[in-house]
């Protein structure tokens, strides 16, 4: 179960990073 938990955490972190990157790009483009 630990492996599956780590996999889910990795996916969640990847999604959060993508959201932050998009937000940063949006702010950079806006400015």
Swiss-Prot record:
PTM comment: Contains 3 disulfide bonds.
Tissues expressed in: Expressed by the venom gland.
Compartmental location: Secreted
Primary location recorded for the protein, binned into one broad class: secreted
Molecular function as annotated in GO: toxin activity
Keyword terms, alphabetized: Disulfide bond, Neurotoxin, Secreted, Toxin
Membrane spanning stretches: none
A cellular component annotation (GO) from this entry: extracellular region
Family: Belongs to the CRISP family. Venom allergen 5-like subfamily.
Additional remark text: Shows similarity with the venom allergen 5 from wasps. This similarity may explain why patients with allergies to centipede venom also display allergic reaction to wasp, honey bee and/or yellow jacket venom.
Protein name: Scolopendra 20566.01 Da toxin
Higher taxonomy: Eukaryota, Metazoa, Ecdysozoa, Arthropoda, Myriapoda
């Amino acid at each position: 179960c630990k492996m599956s938990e780590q996999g889910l955490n990795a996916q969640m972190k990847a999604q959060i990073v993508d959201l932050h990157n998009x937000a940063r790009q949006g702010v950079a483009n806006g400015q």
